[in-house]
Amino acid sequence: AYIGLVYDGNQPLSFLATPGAKDVGIELHSTSKNFNMTGWRCGFVVGNQLLVKAYGDVKDNSDSGQFLAIQNASAYCYDHPEITKSIATKYSRRMDKLVVVLQKSGFKVNKSGGSFFLYMSSAKAAVKTDGKRIEFKNGEALSQWLIREKLISTVPWDDAEPAIRFSVTFAAEDEADEDRVISEIESRLSNVKFEF
């Protein structure tokens, strides 16, 4: 789903490019992330012929296909890869700016190589400029504090370690509006430093 959203000279890498992969696996592609069509549930499957057929059999018995207009819109997107390149450029630009703001606040974070998510270890504490210290036992606690106290939406990601996830999919009309959003995040975090 994210294969086309890569940055900084990285090239999309297909599982099927691995020698022998076509003999043992399949790859699912979707319009949801590459073309900002989340929820449209349209894509395709490639790979091992037997597995593709088995996947088709499951799909035949679980749903009845997509509305033709969605299929046509998806086909248009696949014929226009520049759409994904434009989206990736936008997300890369936003990611660069968000990383700088988060690093200023003490987050240990680097730009990801792709997608629109920015994962990072959860802070153990936040220290306000007045000296007040707030401790977080995990990403869930930090995420809840960020939404309640700073009105910044994140997703806790505590499956492997205490972590949170930011996204650069926020609504913005143009690059100036993106800068406004990033500046607002910076302003909301300006009176706190995070400890790890």
Set out the residue ranges of the language-model regions.
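PLP-dependent class I/II
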Residues: 1-196
